[in-house]
């Protein structure tokens, strides 16, 4: 045996030819090994000229993590619908009135809530201290309306939550505040009116997310190497998959027969098994069902207010507790026996709030969409007598449920105005409250501020010239 001078690896000395060949092979091998080590060292430092590679993560992600990252985007990106700066003032907390204090806030609207930040959300999150969270407003069951009478500023609307919190939002730029109003209103309309339904949906949402995570984890574990007993159970499942498929087909067939044979909605309604709710029903449908031209609930509310609310300060202007109003709404929709003299409806502002909500929830307002432009043209006339005659002519053309309900409502409001010295509610104040509620354009995207002026003026004229219009 002989050792090479350039290597510690022994080389056999059989014959010169073989020895020479072995030395050549050894040199080639050593050179290749040295080249491989050099390449490997370079690959650990540089991938391209002048470009440093990122450190290799030692964490091994499983299959479910890859799926969650690639398929499911961050929840915040899915939920945020709109964000930007607005002027904000909180005027009530849990039903307790607060002093109005306007501040500039960065507002983030998601599908179920609004968050108020003092700065943009990105800056707020980066600067946020532990426990310092933005103010959050749950939109489920909330109510949004224009609140011209609540502030001297222009373009102000109010959000009232189920918990009794009230916020004013404002911007001097018309199209910005209009865009925000419709975005928030659409978000509220998409949510269930019943708070218990909202909580059930929330729980279902959590269950679905947790189930999807478990499913991904289960899928990931199945991709790993299986033990023999697992293979046997897999074969057992495959063996019975054919029978499972036939069972599913039988279930589908039975469901299809059940769906095709079930009675129509009209049949169920005719038999009285399904009834439309009071709130949110078309006025003519509700009156036809009750065999009257004025809804029973409207007459009950007016009777209660005239019995114990004519002299109450700010009647119809002051908001009642929204949670109690929603409770009253639920009872009315269930067509349970309603007694507004009950102690739980002691606050008359709850009754007036429910009455205003009834008119707001009408699919078509008390002044029908088809008459909106005609009423606006009538109020534009210069001569007061001409305006009154034009309005009177239009009122007489309205469908009986609209005309009769209008007559009863405005007749009631004239009694409120007659006690203005005590309740401080003038014709102008009631016009501001009821104008946008009873009269609105089908498409509110244009000239909202101009329409609001006409809405108030029409409501005021209906009150001031009530005897002439409804004579």
Curated annotation (Swiss-Prot):
It is found in: Cytoplasm; Membrane. Disulfide bonds: none annotated. Residues 1-20 are annotated as: Disordered. The keyword Cytoplasm applies. Pfam families: PH, RhoGAP. GO terms for biological process: small GTPase-mediated signal transduction. The keyword Nucleotide-binding does not apply. Gene3D superfamilies: Pleckstrin-homology domain (PH domain)/Phosphotyrosine-binding domain (PTB) (2.30.29.30), Rho GTPase activation protein (1.10.555.10). Residues 79-189 form the PH domain. The modification Phosphoserine is found at residues 43, 196, 199, 243. The record marks 317 as: Arginine finger. Signal peptide: none annotated. Keywords: Cytoplasm, GTPase activation, Membrane, Phosphoprotein. PANTHER family: RHO GTPASE-ACTIVATING PROTEIN 15 (PTHR23176:SF108), RHO/RAC/CDC GTPASE-ACTIVATING PROTEIN (PTHR23176). GTPase activator for the Rho-type GTPases by converting them to an inactive GDP-bound state. Has activity toward RAC1. Overexpression results in an increase in actin stress fibers and cell contraction. This is Rho GTPase-activating protein 15. It comes from Bos taurus (Bovine). The gene is ARHGAP15.
